[in-house]
Structures are given as structure tokens and as C-alpha cells.
Amino acid sequence: YAARIYDARRIPEMLNVAIQKAMSGKPGPVYLDLPGDTLYQMVDEDAIDWSQSGRAILNARPPAPEEQIAELVAALAKAERPVLLTGSGIIWSQAWEEMHALVDATGIPFYTTPQGRGVVPEDHPCCFPAARSTAFRDADLIAVVGTRLNYIVAHLAPPRFSADATIARIDIDVEEIAGSPRKLDIGIVADAKVALGQLNKAIAGKIDPAQYDHWRSALAEKEASKRAGPGSNSLSDAVPIHP
């Protein structure tokens, strides 16, 4: 969101709009331009509408349609090599508990963008950071939650990501779903926290983590191989640090 203020009397109003845009829905940067002639305007304080000031941030949490949640559950149950890829939307939505519960309940390997790290500890048995390329390339289902499909995730494009994988995506911004750079098999417009909560309820008893044992084992083997290779000391926990 970007706007220019020409009338100093509208500063409180437009500042409120900018704050709402920055903090609600899908948070992001905003820009307000105040030209010099606006800054030096002399206005009567009584002519300023202060009613827009101090309004609470609108924090809507749209749920996912139940039929789409059911479709995602069915796709996960059918998948043999699923991957969960999440971003900062998990943090903004405060959905870390729901994500942790989903990973624990299903045993699906997960990866985060740099902006979304830490929502689930990286020493979790379903986290294989050094095997990231293998996971993305070999996955038969990729569930993306709360992240743009930009250069950070290579736009989810082959060959870095499997060309044949089923793509499911949850995002609070309808434009992210409608304008996805990769065709979505399941595109859900919903708040991450609410949608993952719905998914956790719907998935109960329908997925056995053991069905992905072979997938996790393959990634664990690749992880161990990467850690043992050249440069493996960069992953060492040894104390003191080798100079």
C-alpha cells in the first residue's frame, strides 16, 4: 500500500488506513508520502477529524471451506512422499502450536523459509534441513502454508521442485492463491492458524505416521550423508569452536 497525502487534515485518517493495511490480513510494508507543501500547511485543529485515530487493528481470521480441508486430508492420506513448506505467515498468525501438532500427528517432513524458522525446532525428527533439495525434488505432495511463492522458494518451479507433485497451498491473501506462479491442485484462502487447526481435527485417525517411515528414512540417510561430507564441520556442535 502506498499513498500521498495532499491535505494535512487527512493525516490521521490516512495514517490509520496505512496501519490497518500493514498489520491486518497479510501484514506487509506500507508507504505514506507527505510532500513538503503538505507538511507546512497550517490548518485549524478543529477541522481535523480525529475519530479515525486509535482504531483497533482488524484481525480477521477466515476459516477454510470444510470441503477443501477434506480434499487436503484425502491427498495427504494418498501421498507417499509429502512435504510441508511454511513461511512467516505461521508466525504472523501465531500458528506454531497448530503446525507443531500437525507435524507430530502425521510425521510429515517439514521445511521453513528463512523468515519462518523456529516455529518447530529444527532438531525435530521430521526436520531434515541438509536434505532439502532431495525432499523438494522427490516429493509427491507439497503443502505450502503462509509463504509467497517467490525467489526464496524458487517459485516452486521444476527442476528444484518436483514437476509431478500435487501442490496444496493455504494463504490468507486471495491474490496469492489466484495469482500463484505454479498451478495449484488445492488452493485454500484462509488464516494459517485457523486452517491448520481445522486440518488437525479433520486428520485425526486418518493418517498413520508409519506410512511415511520409508520417506523419512530416505531423507534421514541423505541428511547423514550431507553432514558427513566436505564442510561437515560447519554443522558441528563441538566446543570450543574449531578456529
Label each residue range with its predicted role.
Residues 64-65, 71, 76-142:
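Anionic-ligand anchoring segments at beta-strand to alpha-helix junctions in alpha/beta enzyme folds, i.e.
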Residues 218-243:
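Active-site diphosphate/adenylate-binding microenvironment
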Residues 1-14, 113-218:
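Glycine-rich, acidic loop regions that bind phosphate or pyrophosphate groups
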